[in-house]
């Protein structure tokens, strides 16, 4: 007898709901239990997937993130000079852009690494993953670095959006990807600035 697809284990990218089955379903990180700790008290005993296998792979990732951030700033410097009809140096733009670019690069690299490591471990399993249907065309606007961090990188809906993009790009063909716009209550809302 062939099992129903709903019997397959699920991978939760964001907060678990009441249908979560401990020992059957997977969660990508501890953030999946925020506000649900009492409902699922054994969450603290789950071994979550790390983005890095060891200190060496973490060191390599740091170097790669730094190189990527530098190349992004070079591209942005040219674009911003043209847009504002200026001829500021790379160093000028570096000073202004390194913090948000490096912070974003590290965030994305870690999320990509976590998913990539998880896929290596579970690529043969018939998982079900519910993802955010939005694409890169979605607009997320941030006023400054603080807004980027609080309303983007630390925002549950934004994290779910980014993880969904990565999953949609990397998921093995054994996984069933289900798009839904109702996974998070604030999924269709733009972030509300937390800082003036």
Residue ranges of model-derived segments:
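Catalytic-core helical/loop segments in enzymes performing group transfer/polymerization on anionic/lipid-linked
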Residues: 1-196
């Amino acid at each position: 007898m062939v099992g129903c697809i709903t019997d397959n284990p699920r991978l939760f990218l964001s907060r678990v709901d009441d249908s979560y089955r401990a020992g059957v379903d997977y969660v990508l990180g501890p953030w999946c239990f925020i506000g649900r700790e009492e409902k699922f008290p054994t969450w603290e005993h789950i071994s979550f997937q790390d983005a890095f296998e060891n200190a060496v792979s973490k060191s390599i990732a740091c170097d790669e993130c730094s190189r990527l951030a530098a190349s992004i700033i070079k591209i942005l410097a040219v674009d911003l000079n043209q847009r504002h009809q200026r001829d500021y140096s790379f160093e000028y733009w570096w000073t202004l852009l390194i913090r948000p670019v490096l912070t974003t690069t590290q965030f994305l690299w870690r999320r990509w690494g976590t998913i990539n490591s998880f896929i290596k471990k579970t690529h043969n399993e018939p998982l079900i993953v519910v993802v955010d249907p939005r694409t890169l065309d979605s607009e997320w606007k941030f006023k400054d670095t603080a807004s980027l961090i609080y309303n983007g990188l630390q925002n549950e809906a934004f994290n779910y959006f980014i993880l969904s993009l990565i999953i949609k790009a990397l998921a093995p063909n054994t996984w069933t990807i289900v798009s839904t716009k109702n996974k998070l209550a604030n999924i269709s809302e733009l972030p509300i600035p937390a800082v003036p």
